[in-house]
Structures are given as structure tokens and as C-alpha cells.
């Protein structure tokens, strides 16, 4: 079901997000919110990521994962808020999508959060955590720790430790990618 949007008809955004989205609908939402002149619509979409309706929140997060690089820059201002959400999120789908958004953001040496590094380490070593989340946390741990050789040594030791367990192809790929950089 395709929705036609215009600036005064933004209420349809939440309605659209209540059902399974097609690729065409995702593209429509991205087009609706693209450009700096639509930052207010990006903010509305972001607020829908916090919606009590799980489907709405997940679809809003999923839409952000499809943003073009130029529009993704808008999310950089939400960096700490996204990290805070990761630390508290219990829904694995929402967590995976938030981690995906964080993977598309820069991690500066001055703005590193040790609580998020600890979060990533806890997920990397948790054999019960979903493979996708573990793989994302491997990459995010590297992005945060790459400025400090002593932290990279700790990451290398952790990755060597988990290499003894059976790893999914996706987790093995993330492991290999980061080990090559170490």
C-alpha cells in the first residue's frame, strides 16, 4: 500500500509505519525526509523510533538505516542518545537496528564512552547474544578503540578468545575484518 505524502500530510507517516513496509515505501519515506530543509521531518521520524508501538519504532529505525550518506549526517547529533538507547534496549531487533545506525557514524577520539566499550565487550563474549549483534559489537569496539594500542591489544585478546567457539559466517567475517586491522 503506497502512501502519497506532502508536508501537511505527515500524519500518514505513523500510519505507514504500522504495517510491514515495502522497499518502495522505505524509499518514499527517505525521499520525504531528505535534505536539510526536512530536518523537522527527520526529527518526527526519529521520535517515532521511540513509539510505544513496536512495529512503528522498528520501521522508523529501519527507515533510518536506508538514509543516504548526506541525510545520515543528521543522525550524528543523536550519537550519545543512540548509545544510551543501546545500553538500555532489551528488544534485539531494535538493538540491532540502533547498532547499524551507530556503525554509520564516526567515533572521535575525544568522545569515546567507556560504558559503550564495556557494552560491546559484554556482547562480543556473550555466546547467547544474537550473532548479528555480536558482529556489530566487534566492529563498533574496533571503531572506538582504534586510537589506543593498549585497548586494541585487549580487543585482540578478546577476539582470539572467541575464535575457539563456533562462529556463524557473519560473525566470522566481522572477526576476520577486525583482526586484519589489528
Regions found by a protein language model. Name each.
Residues 3-182:
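Alpha-helical scaffold domains
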